C-alpha cells in the first residue's frame, strides 16, 4: 500500500536544527533538479521497493508482536516457513524519564534465541500491516518528482541532507551500513515530534527510527503510543513527490483550500493525483477537448502564441448542475498538464477584517505566478463574486473589484490560467465574463444517454458485476437526469447490497469464502433509492400508474403515445418524413374524467422525467418572480431531457391577457419558452384543464399546445372496465352485475364510478364489520345516493369549444 506523507521543503544551509519536524532538507542542487522551492508543501509517496507496516497496541512496557519478513535460510534455521509471521520478544531498558522508554528487540522462535549474527545477515524486513506515518531508512534511495529526472543513489547522499520524520540519507550503499550522513550528529539527542495531526490515535511519538542491524529496532517512545509504526526501505525503494490533493490519510480533511486561514503560508499543490486522468472521466469528451485547447496549448507551445502575436485565454468558466464533474475535469487537465493547482473557495478566503480578503486573493495569484505552470481554481465563484447590486455588501464589492484587477493582470502571467466553477452562472458579476477575464465558458451539463453509458461502464469496471451490454444499454436509457455523482451513488448502493448478500451467503454456508458480484437486481434496487439530484427541486413521487389502471379513453391513450413515446422510440422515422413532434398537449374535459391520472400514467409508462407543476404554485407577490419560476421549470426540463412538464389546472396560470398584469407576464414567459429563440428539444408540455375557455388563445395555436385532446365522460364499455378494475382491487361477490352497474352510471365521470364502488364497500362494512365481500345489494343502495356532477349544459359547452378550435391530431 502506498504511503503519502506531508513535508515542507527547507534549504540545507547548515543552520537548521533537527528539532524542526516534518521538513525535507535539500541542497540547492536538489531543489533545482526537483523544481521545488523553499516552504513548498509536498507529499512523499513510496514507489517500489519493500515498505509495509503493522500496528500493535502497547501492553505493559513493550511493543509487539511484529511481523517480520525473513529469508528462506533464516526460516530453515529457525524451523519456520519463509515469510511466516513470528513474534519479536522485548527487552525493556528504562532510561531517563525525559527520553521515555528505550525498547531493543531481538528475534526469537519457540522461546529459543536466534544468533544475532544470523539475524544481521538474513533479516530482510520488519513489516507492519497498517499504512504508517513515518518512513526512515539507512540505505540510499531514489527520489523524483513526477515528470522529472530521478536523483540516483549515487548523488542522493550529497544532495539530500535529511528528511526529518522521513528519510535519513546515508552515504553507504549496502542495507545496514552504519556510516551516517556527515551532516547528522549521532550523539545529538533525537528530535521531539508531535504527530497527533497525522495519526488516528491520540499520542505523541518522540522518534521511531530504524538504525543498523546491530540494534535491529530502536524505538524511543512515551508509553501513550497506541499504534507504533516503523518503516524500512531497501536500496530498491524510491520516493516520489506527489500532490497533496486526495493523498491525505483517511482522517484528514480532503477539501483543504489553497489558502490556510490559520497560517500566512499558501498551500502549493504539485499537480493533482495521477489517479484522476482523462481515462477516468466518462461522458465529457467534448468538454475535455475544449478545456485542453485552452490550458495545454499555451502551456506546451507558448512560443507559437508569441509568434502569432495573440494572447492565450487566461480564464475559463465551467458551469453546470452539481455533480456533473466540473472539479474532476479541472483535476484531470491539471494532471495532464503537470500543473500545480491553487484552490480558492469562497468561505475560506473571505476574511473578517477590512482588506483581508483582497490580500489573500493577491497572495494566491502571486504564488501561482511563482510556481508555473499553475492553475488557479475558483470553486463556487458565484459566492465570491456575486453581481454588484444594491443588496451586495461593500466587502463583497471590493472582493469582486480585486478579482477583476487580478484577472486583468494575467496578460503577462506566463503559464498560469484561472478556472472557475459554478452551478449559477447568471449570479456571477457580468464584468467577470467579458474577454480577457473568464472569456471561455464551457457547460458541463447533465449527461445524455451515450454519456451515461460511458459513465456507468467506467464505474462498473472496478466492481465485480454480472451485467451484460444489453442491460447496460437499458440502464443508461432509464437514468434520465442522473449526473455522474448520481450514477456513482447508484453503483455504490448496488455494491453495498451485493456485499450484504455475500455476507448472508457466507453465514449460510458455514463461513466458506463466497464472493458475489453486482447483479441487475442490485442496480434496480439502487435506482429506486437514489433520486436525480438535478430534479429534486421539481420531481414528484413516482406515480406508479399504468395504462391498465385507466378504464376506457383508448383514443386519448393512443394520441398521447404518438405525442410522447413515438418521438423517442421512432425518432428516425420523424426525421425521415420531416415530421415535427408536437411541443404541447392540452387535455380538457369535465372534472373527474381521468385527465390527471392519464398524465401520471404517461410518466410511468414512458419512464421520462416528469415535472409536475400546479398553476397557483408559480405565482409570487413580487414582480418578476413568477416569470423567473417559469424559466427555471423549463431550464430544468431542458437539462433533464427527455422530459415532460405537466401543468395541472393551467387555466389558473394562463388566463386571458388584459385582465391581470401578473397573468399577462406569466403567459408571455410561457409563450417565449414554448417557441422562443431557445429551442425546446425533447421536452413535451402536457397541460390539463376543465376551463379551456379561460386559457389565452395564443397558447393553443400550432407550435405551442398544438394537440387538444378532449377527455370526456366514459362510455358504457369504459365504465364497465372501470368497475372491473375496481373488482380486482376489492372483494366483489359473484352476484355483482358489472353490466348493470355500467348501465346505471351513464353520464357519470370515471371518478364518480370509482366513488360508487367505494361507497358500496362502506355500506357493506356498515351492515357487518365482519363482511367478507361486497354484494349487488350494496351497489343498489349506493346507486340511490349517486350524484352526477356532469350536466347536459356542461357537455354542450365542451362540444361548442371543440368546434371553435382547430385540433391537430
Curated annotation (Swiss-Prot):
Residues 169-199 are annotated as: Disordered. GO terms for cellular component: cytoplasm; cytosol. ATP 2 binds at residues 589-596. One of its GO terms (biological process) is ribosomal large subunit biogenesis. Keywords: ATP-binding, Chaperone, Cytoplasm, Hydrolase, Nucleotide-binding, Repeat. It holds the Pfam family AAA_lid_3. ATP 1 binds at residues 320-327. SMART domains: AAA (SM00382). Transmembrane segments: none annotated. It is found in: Cytoplasm. Belongs to the AAA ATPase family. AFG2 subfamily. The first ATP-binding region binds ATP with low affinity whereas the second ATP-binding region binds ATP with high affinity. Homohexamer; ATP binding induces oligomerization. Forms a ring-shaped particle of about 12 nm diameter, that displays 6-fold radial symmetry. Associates with cytoplasmic pre-60S ribosomal particles. PANTHER family: AAA-FAMILY ATPASE, ATPASE FAMILY GENE 2 PROTEIN HOMOLOG A. This is ATPase family gene 2 protein. It comes from Schizosaccharomyces pombe (strain 972 / ATCC 24843).
